[in-house]
C-alpha cells in the first residue's frame, strides 16, 4: 500500500500525529517522537523525513543514515530508562511512511517476552511527565 504524502500524518504533521505522539527533536534524516501512550515506559518512534514506503526504497547511504538515527534514539532510551530490551517494530501495513516503533521492555513489565501492543490505551501522563521523559531522552542523544 502506497499512500499519498498529502494524506500522510508524518508529512502533513497533522492533528492525528499530535494526538498520538510528541516530537522530541529532528535528527539527521528523520524525526524522533515520544508516544503519548506509555504502557511501555519510554516508548518512542523514529520517522524518516521523506515519504518512502519501505527501508528497501532507500539508497545504502540513506538507509545507513536512517538506521544511525534509530540507533541514536535507542541508545538514548537505554541510558534514560534502562529497559531490559528495546523491541523494534516497522509494520507500515496501513500507513506507508517509513518509521520504526521503539518499545522498551522491562522484565516485570507488560508483554515481556512477547510482542508489544500497538496502542494498549492504558497509560497516559501529564504534560510535565512527558516533558521530563523528553528531556531525559534529549540529554542522552
Where do the protein language model's features map onto the residues?
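HIT superfamily nucleotide-processing domains
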Residues: 1-141
Amino acid at each position: 500500500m502506497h499512500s499519498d504524502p498529502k494524506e500522510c500524518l508524518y508529512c502533513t504533521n497533522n492533528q492525528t500525529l499530535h494526538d498520538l505522539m510528541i516530537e522530541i527533536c529532528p535528527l539527521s534524516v528523520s524525526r524522533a517522537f515520544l508516544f503519548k501512550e506509555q504502557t511501555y515506559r519510554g516508548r518512542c518512534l523514529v520517522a524518516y523525513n521523506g515519504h518512502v514506503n519501505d527501508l528497501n526504497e532507500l539508497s545504502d547511504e540513506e538507509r545507513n543514515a536512517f538506521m544511525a538515527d534509530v540507533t541514536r534514539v535507542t541508545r538514548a532510551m537505554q541510558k534514560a530508562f534502562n529497559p531490559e530490551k528495546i523491541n523494534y517494530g516497522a509494520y507500515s501495513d496501513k500507513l506507508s511512511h517509513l518509521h520504526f516503533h521503539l518499545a522498551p521492555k522491562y522484565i516485570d513489565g507488560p508483554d515481556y517476552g512477547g510482542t508489544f501492543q500497538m496502542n494498549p490505551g492504558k497509560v497516559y501522563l501529564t504534560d510535565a511527565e512527558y516533558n521530563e521523559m523528553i528531556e531525559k531522552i534529549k540529554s542522552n542523544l
